[in-house]
């Protein structure tokens, strides 16, 4: 069987196994008997402040539990205007992704419209993580029963029209595969040049992957789309998987704190039920929530401690390195390769992990 056919036939179970290898490796921070790391115990009171400027955003998401928690974080910001949420296949199929986004926004008291986007990837392959997030993407906890329906119209057209009507004002916060964004760039390249910035939760950063040893799931799900986005010339900030390890992971005690809040906190805690089971079954007592961390990078300037300009290239050829994103760091001298690229991304290299959970907790109360 050739590699392309093999990738197209990959099962959810196989993907879950691939996810596990990296996720659990990232979660191997030594913990106390209560499951809380020493660093988390000593920095429990740390928080950072959200942006004080008015922000116009479109959130593009493949809504699973982690995406929903990020939507809630954004919806609770006083200075953030969510112009719309565009959804696509990724963690779950398009219909589930749509319902999950509607449910999260409804609970958070946000009436931003939700637009359906891509039900497929650019190359026709579909990979999802049902075995990680549950069949409904929200922990199979009976949380998804939205009263509203998706807005009329296509997500890609909504992105293009909104950017056109708000030139140099709209930030795209991309929490899943880049399919909707790539289609918008292909369809209206001139209009999309008016995007203020793209914030992407994607790539392995400078660390290991979770879909494969070198690839992160959001890129792996549609590498061709991610390459189009990277090559577009639009201003992009990337938050990689490597930012989500150690103290940035959530413990059982922290999730219990969320559940005690009732309302949005309880919703988030319950939606993480299946992924907590998945992590525990594979030897980890903490869980990643990369999407909320990426949202915090976008909306809380003080949360990001350091960045580096890079040239990022995405490998789209079939093989072991499929969907790996390679970063050439500005100012770094390589022994052989000449580092004279046009730098197309800002890569986040350090965040205030110790403030992550408490900032999230304060925001959604």
Where are the language model's segments positioned?
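Bacterial N-terminal signal peptides that target proteins for export
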Residues: 2-14
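C-terminal motif of bacterial Sec signal peptides marking the signal peptidase cleavage site
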Residues: 21-25
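N-terminal, intrinsically disordered, polar/charged segments of Gram-positive cell-envelope systems
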Residues: 29-54
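Conformational coupling and interaction surfaces
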Residues: 50-55, 73-82, 220, 224, ...
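A glycine-rich helix N-cap at a beta->alpha junction
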Residues: 104, 108-115
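A residue-level signal for conserved active-site and pocket-lining positions in enzyme catalytic cores
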Residues: 114, 229, 295
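Surface-exposed loop and adjacent secondary-structure segments within mature catalytic domains
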Residues: 115-146
């Amino acid at each position: 069987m050739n590699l392309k056919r093999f990738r197209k036939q990959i099962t959810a179970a196989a993907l879950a196994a691939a996810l596990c290898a990296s996720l659990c490796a990232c979660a191997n921070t030594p913990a106390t008997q209560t499951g809380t790391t020493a660093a988390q115990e000593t920095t429990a009171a740390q928080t950072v402040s959200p942006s004080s400027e008015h922000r116009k955003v479109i959130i593009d998401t493949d809504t699973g539990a982690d995406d929903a928690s990020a939507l809630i974080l954004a919806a609770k910001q006083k200075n953030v205007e969510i112009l719309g949420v565009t959804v696509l296949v990724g963690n779950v199929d398009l219909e589930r992704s749509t319902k999950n986004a509607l449910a999260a926004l409804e609970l958070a008291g946000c009436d931003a419209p939700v637009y359906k986007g891509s039900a497929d990837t650019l190359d026709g392959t579909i990979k999802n993580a049902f075995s990680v997030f549950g069949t409904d993407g929200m922990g199979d906890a009976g949380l998804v029963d939205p009263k509203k329906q998706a807005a009329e119209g296509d997500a890609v057209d909504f992105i293009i029209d909104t950017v056109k009507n708000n030139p140099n004002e709209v930030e795209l916060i991309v929490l899943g595969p880049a399919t909707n964004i790539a289609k918008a760039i292909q369809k209206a390249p001139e209009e999309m040049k008016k995007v203020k910035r793209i914030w992407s939760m994607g790539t392995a950063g400078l660390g290991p992957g979770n879909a494969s040893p070198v690839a992160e799931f959001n890129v792996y799900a549609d590498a061709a789309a991610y390459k189009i986005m990277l090559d577009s010339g639009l201003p992009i900030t990337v938050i990689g998987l490597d930012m989500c390890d150690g103290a940035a992971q959530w413990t059982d005690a922290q999730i219990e704190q969320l559940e005690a809040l009732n309302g949005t906190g309880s919703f988030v805690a319950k939606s993480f039920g299946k992924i907590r089971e998945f992590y525990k079954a594979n030897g980890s007592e903490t869980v990643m929530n990369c999407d909320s961390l990426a949202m915090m990078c976008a909306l809380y300037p003080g949360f990001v401690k350091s960045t580096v300009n890079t040239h990022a290239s995405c490998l789209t050829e079939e093989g072991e390195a499929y969907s790996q994103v390679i970063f050439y760091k500005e100012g770094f001298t390589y022994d052989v390769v000449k580092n004279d690229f046009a730098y197309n991304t800002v890569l986040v290299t350090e965040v205030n992990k110790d403030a992550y959970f408490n900032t999230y907790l304060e925001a959604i109360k």
